[in-house]
Amino acid sequence: MTELKFKGVYVEDIGHLTCGTLTLTENSINFIGDKGGKSVYITGTDVDKLKWQKLGNKPGLRVGLSDGGAHRFGGFLDDDLQKIQSFTSSNWSKSINQSNLFINGWNYGQADVKGKNIEFSWENEPIFEIPCTNVSNVIANKNEAILEFHQNEQSKVQLMEMRFHMPVDLENEEDTDKVEEFKKAVLAYAGLEAETEQPICLLTDILCTTPRGRYDIKVYPTSIALHGKTYDYKIPVKTINRLFLVPHKDGRQVYFVLSLNPPIRQGQTHYSYLIFEFGKDEEEDLELSLTDEQLDYFNGNLQREMTGPIYETISILFKSICNLKVTVPGRFLGSSGTPAIQCTHRQNLGLLYPMEKGFLFIQKPVMYIRFEEISSCHFARSDSGTVTRTFDFEIDLKTGSSLTFSAMDKEENNKLFDYLNKKEIKIRNSHRIDNKSAGYGSSDEDDIDPYKSTVKAEGREQDDDSDDESTDEDYDLDKDMKKQKNDKDSSEGSGSEPDDEYDSGSEKDASGTGESDPDEENIEPKKKESKEKKNKREKKEKPVKEKAVKKGKKTKDPNEPKRATTAYIIWFNANRNSMKEDGDTLGDVAKKAGAKWKSMSADDKKEWNDKAAQDKARYEAEMKEYKKNGGGVEKASGPSTKKSSDQSPGKQFKSKEHISDTDDSDDDEPLKAKKDESDAASESSGESD
């Protein structure tokens, strides 16, 4: 048998089990992952040891290599052991040893570095094994060794950190430090340089804003080491995928940003970006420990002695070591004359940089948003008040989520708008802010915030309603008083009785003779003046009464039919629970629903449009029956009041003369008193006759 093939076998790759096909031939072991996954090729001469031990909950094959590495395959059947045993013994002259894992659940044992693997065992029985290549960083802290691991994005459950406590044996004191020796042994096979090697460059007391602190930075050919007062980091050069150099808004500082994948960790916090801050006028001479071969390798971009601003020399150094371009801002300039726009994101103050191929936000959290990830942008009014000098900038991603940058200065609106147009990025409210106007016609504020324009429209409608409902706005008191005086003079000349509608005869001439007292001329101006004051006072109190009427209008009739529901609301209520995930707020669910509704076809929406049409027909039928039974009659009370008042100006004046200054329920009592006084005057006049 020259070939042995197993399907449905998986290989362990940084905590992720990649499924594929394992093929054993006379000269090699070949594993090909399904759907273009990981592939492994091992020659027969590189195989050192073979062990049959479980991987997960199924039997597995551990293939030890001659260089100290190992590959583990799982998903076999118990009967496959005999097949593999006979094949390896006949073709490779290798036997398979059965190795049982110690699974008592103990958390203590012996931690050793065997080959390129960290093996934790108890009395020579293995408990678990971790390849040293999976380790991203080792921190030695007194009697404790902290291991941090690389991450596999395909794995749902990932090993982030592991700590080994190594107590000191007081009876057998040794000069060697167990933790430090363990650290050196792991670093030897983890692809990270040990501290004993000579770095290319040493940068001291460098301010790092993310993660916060001052660090000494050692630059190696394949890694970068950061040493702080509390934390140390080792970053492989291959994990650095982008470099940014951007100025601060004040023009005095410069940010140098490193993008990392996978990110480094500090406790439970991940840092996908490192931000170094340098003074723009700060200069420093750097001496690089480079050989002639290394200088030739970097094509003359680096020199043994480099002078100039520190941010320039460091950016050139990292550009050569990482073999990456340094991304700088393009031609965009904000109102401050710099490429930075000050704003806030989730209550954190920061700077937004429109770059040539994306947006860079510094600093909590640091984000780089590429244009290819953006579906559209939106300008919205800030929520700080009705009259505001700031706006919000929203970025909608193709994944369905959105990012909001708030409190941007209004002067940045047009500059950012023109920038998006040049980059051909879709803008939902595609218009600039050119004119500044006040009042209801403020087009710039209405364009930024559609909700505000709606509120203003409602305000205009309310003003129109108040003009229509006002019965005393066009009333002229002086004309009415002159008319009364003319009517009074004409009635005295003709000897006729005064009109009962005007109470002048009953108030001024109790004898009924039609003649006035000598002091009547002095009393008339006082009464006129008092009426003018009372009229002004009533006009001031009018808005209070109008508000009371308007509040009454807003009260909803409980018998009024329920309004018709739109197709989107019916669909949203039916599918809200299925779209909600753990931790989602109502706003998150609404955004997901809106995006999903827009993507639905007309056929998908047909069911809900039909339901909305049925609900609309139901509402129209119920509303017709409601109005037929007298519903909504109260709305006609305003115009009828105006009509009655327009027909009788005299009665209108009388009502204003006798209206009380208060809004109590005793408003009719002055009218009753006046009527009694008038009746008494008529009786006395009859007795005198």
From Swiss-Prot:
Region named Disordered: 434-565, 592-689
Chief localization: nucleus
Statement: the UniProt record of this protein carries the keyword Ligase: no
The keyword DNA-binding is assigned to this record: yes
Compositional bias segments (type: Basic and acidic residues): 478-491, 523-532, 538-563, 601-628
Location relative to the cell: Nucleus; Chromosome
Keywords tagged on the record: Chromosome, DNA damage, DNA repair, DNA replication, DNA-binding, Nucleus, Transcription, Transcription regulation
Annotated GO MF terms: DNA binding; histone binding; nucleosome binding
UniProt note on tissues of expression: Expressed in the germline.
Phenotypic effect of disruption: RNAi-mediated knockdown at the L4 larval stage results in less than 10% embryonic lethality in offspring and surviving adults are sterile. Double RNAi-mediated knockdown with hmg-4 at the L4 larval stage results in 60% embryonic lethality in offspring. Double RNAi-mediated knockdown with hmg-4 in embryos results in defective cell cycle initiation, duration and completion and in failed development of the anterior pharynx.
GO biological process, one term: DNA repair
InterPro entries named in the record: HMG_box_dom (IPR009071), HMG_box_dom_sf (IPR036910), PH-like_dom_sf (IPR011993), RTT106/SPT16-like_middle_dom (IPR013719), RTT106/SSRP1_HistChap/FACT (IPR050454), SSRP1-like_PH1 (IPR048993), SSRP1/POB3 (IPR000969), SSRP1/POB3_N (IPR035417)
GO CC annotation, single: FACT complex
PROSITE patterns: HMG_BOX_2
Compositionally biased spans, kind Acidic residues: 461-477
DNA-binding region boundaries: 561-627
Biased composition regions of type Polar residues, renumbered to the chain: 638-650
Similarity remark: Belongs to the SSRP1 family.
Function as written in the Swiss-Prot or TrEMBL entry: Component of the FACT complex, a general chromatin factor that acts to reorganize nucleosomes. The FACT complex is involved in multiple processes that require DNA as a template such as mRNA elongation, DNA replication and DNA repair. During transcription elongation the FACT complex acts as a histone chaperone that both destabilizes and restores nucleosomal structure.
Quaternary context: Component of the FACT complex, a stable heterodimer of hmg-3 and spt-16. The FACT complex may also include hmg-4 instead of hmg-3.
Protein's name in the database: FACT complex subunit ssrp1-B
Organism: Caenorhabditis elegans
Gene: hmg-3
